[in-house]
A protein has these predicted regions:
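Short, flexible loop segments at the rims of nucleotide/cofactor-binding pockets, characterized by
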Residues: 43-44, 72, 169-170
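C-terminal cap of thioredoxin/glutaredoxin-like
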Residues: 5-7, 39, 150-227
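Bacterial N-terminal signal peptides
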Residues: 19-32
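Structural alpha/beta surface segment adjacent to cysteine/selenocysteine redox centers
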Residues: 66, 71, 77-152
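Extracellular/periplasmic catalytic domains that process cell-envelope and extracellular macromolecules
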Residues: 57-60, 87-89, 106, 183-188
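A short beta-strand-turn-helix
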Residues: 44-63
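N-terminal secretory signal peptides that target proteins for export/translocation
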Residues: 1-16
């Protein structure tokens, strides 16, 4: 099997899943991921916010979704399609912040890679993020992440340099996001808020129960319209 074909089999969200071995490997990795996910169950009471300065929509928006996520967090991968659906449905920004947890061995690098793809186009960077989440169960080491990233770049006709961040600028941006999350008071991933500007209601509401995400957005939009 050629190197490129082997990579295609390894990342099922990029290519059709084939072979019994892949199913068995996925089942084993799912068990590991499920165990890891238990570390990140959000508290029912939500986050005690210490610094709310970042919990506001970007310029020009009245309502937005703000998320702090880790690329190895299984619950972040589960939340991603819903957040994208909500942002598209309501035509509001999805503001993603990196919060790579210290116990994970490749999430920081994935965050740096995503920011490098952002330098080519924001759409490409977001597509990389989405594909990392979609293939998360197959990316079980830094070496596999590197192979995944090489294939993603090749599939999108982008020349991937030997070092994507030789000066450490992108890594510094990821660290700044993590420090911001610490200042806010984040203790788990994903942490998600619906935030508003010029609203008579709460300026930000944490989405503790994701089944209520659309309801919270509806309320935020109604609050901004009533002013």
């Amino acid at each position: 099997m050629s190197h490129s074909l082997a990579l295609a089999h390894r990342f099922p969200a990029l290519r059709p899943r084939t072979g019994l071995w892949l199913g068995l490997a996925a089942a084993a990795l799912l068990a590991v991921a499920a165990a890891a996910q238990a570390q990140f169950v959000p508290p029912e009471t939500g986050t005690q916010v210490h610094d709310a300065s970042a919990l506001k929509p970007p310029a020009g928006a009245r309502v937005a979704i703000v998320e702090f996520a880790d690329y190895e967090c299984p619950d972040c991968a589960r939340a991603n399609p819903l957040l994208k659906e909500a942002a598209a449905k309501y035509k509001i920004p999805l503001v993603r912040h990196d919060f790579p947890l210290p116990m994970h061995n490749w999430s920081f690098t994935a965050a740096v890679n995503a920011r490098w793809f952002d330098t080519k186009s924001k759409a490409l960077g977001d597509e990389y993020r989405d594909q990392v989440f979609a293939n998360q169960i197959s990316i079980y080491s830094p070496a596999i992440l590197a192979q995944f990233t090489e294939k993603f770049a090749a599939d999108h006709h982008v020349a991937l340099p030997f070092a994507v961040d030789p000066q450490g600028k992108l890594a510094a941006e990821v660290k700044a996001d993590y420090a911001l999350g610490q200042r806010i008071g984040i203790e788990h991933t994903p942490t998600i808020w619906v935030v508003t500007a010029n609203s008579k209601g709460a300026p930000f509401v944490e989405v503790v129960d994701r089944s209520k995400l659309f309801q919270l957005i509806d309320q935020a939009i109604a609050d901004t319209r009533s002013r």
